[in-house]
Amino acid sequence: MRAVVQRVISSKVEVDGKVIGSIGKGLNVLLGISKEDTEEDIKYLKEKIINLRIFEDENEKLNKSLLDIGGDIIIVSQFTLYGDCRKGRRPSFIEALGGEEAYILYNKFVESIKKEVNNVATGEFGADMKVYIENDGPVTILLDSKKTF
């Protein structure tokens, strides 16, 4: 399971011109799910994301987590995080989990976050979305539950 985690001032997702999810200060998470992912990957990434100390304290040091600041989170599914561009010019998505299986793991991830964070918004799984991100910093962190980077 992979995530691109961005510290944001605000973020929103539109589908067919309608806002379906929006947040204020917090994290925008683009989430990719692989064929190898399990509930253990969900647990690892959830704990890592909600406890990442990427918000500034009173001394402007990155010492506070999403939980510490009571921030919001928006989670957007993005299978392209498993795009393999090592061969040729067209990404291969063979490692990305698709369809119903990915939808189930995505929802389990979202539900695990909802148990910890008050304001959780999402995109629409499988939809063509417009994602608006007002970065703060910018601070962008790449996470992989298999620890490949």
From Swiss-Prot:
InterPro entries documented for this protein: Daa-tRNA_deacyls_DTD, DTD-like_sf
Gene Ontology molecular function terms on file: D-tyrosyl-tRNA(Tyr) deacylase activity; Gly-tRNA(Ala) deacylase activity; Ser(Gly)-tRNA(Ala) hydrolase activity; tRNA binding
Keywords assigned by UniProt, alphabetized: Cytoplasm, Hydrolase, RNA-binding, tRNA-binding
SUPFAM superfamilies: DTD-like (SSF69500)
EC number: 3.1.1.96
Compartments where located: Cytoplasm
Coiled coil: none
Entry keyword annotation includes Phosphoprotein: no
Catalytic reactions of this protein: glycyl-tRNA(Ala) + H2O = tRNA(Ala) + glycine + H(+); a D-aminoacyl-tRNA + H2O = a tRNA + a D-alpha-amino acid + H(+)
Gene3D superfamilies per UniProt: D-tyrosyl-tRNA(Tyr) deacylase (3.50.80.10)
Broad class of the protein's primary localization: cytoplasm
Family in the record: Belongs to the DTD family.
Subunit composition and interactions: Homodimer.
The protein, known as: D-aminoacyl-tRNA deacylase
Species this chain originates from: Clostridium botulinum (strain Langeland / NCTC 10281 / Type F)
